[in-house]
């Protein structure tokens, strides 16, 4: 038991990352602590997006700090997609070689009339399945099509095979929020260290 505790502590003490990205369209910095308590410090300049990222942090228990300055005078596309890129990169960096983690996670999240499920495999083979439809083009000032762009960027840069499916729902706010919460809960399981793995990848191949 002492050996397992040592392995667990040695892995979790370093599961943090800071990543910055600067282009002509956006300037973004992200800090993550995978073994946090879900603290969120989010400023993207997009109110509803901030709300969604807050949910992502709180329900994954990942401490998440995001600062984004983007060309929102044009539209929100660059800010949302690029934020997904940097959060994904930060999670992947914090995971290191992806060894010793549970790897898989899934969650069903109900939100009033809405039910959404998410499944994730932290396998370094990025893929997104997105089966989500909205009844309106916007939630607040944010285009609903941008949610797919965010999750595509998150999965692509986080080494995630991610499936998100809204099973049913009517309220667009509930549909969007349940997608973030379901993904958060799936990640919460997948990033959990399993000391029985001894720091090795959860793979029959011995590597990811």
From Swiss-Prot:
Which GO BP terms, alphabetically?
Answer: L-histidine biosynthetic process
Give the intrachain disulfide bonds: none
Name the principal localization, coarsely classed.
cytoplasm
Q: What class of enzyme is it?
A: lyase
Signal: is it a keyword of this entry?
no
Key words of the record? Amino-acid biosynthesis, Cytoplasm, Histidine biosynthesis, Lyase
Question: Annotated pathway, please?
Answer: Amino-acid biosynthesis; L-histidine biosynthesis; L-histidine from 5-phospho-alpha-D-ribose 1-diphosphate: step 6/9
| HAMAP family tied to this protein | HisB (MF_00076)
Stated name of the protein: Imidazoleglycerol-phosphate dehydratase
Q: What organism is listed for this UniProt entry?
A: Hyphomonas neptunium (strain ATCC 15444)
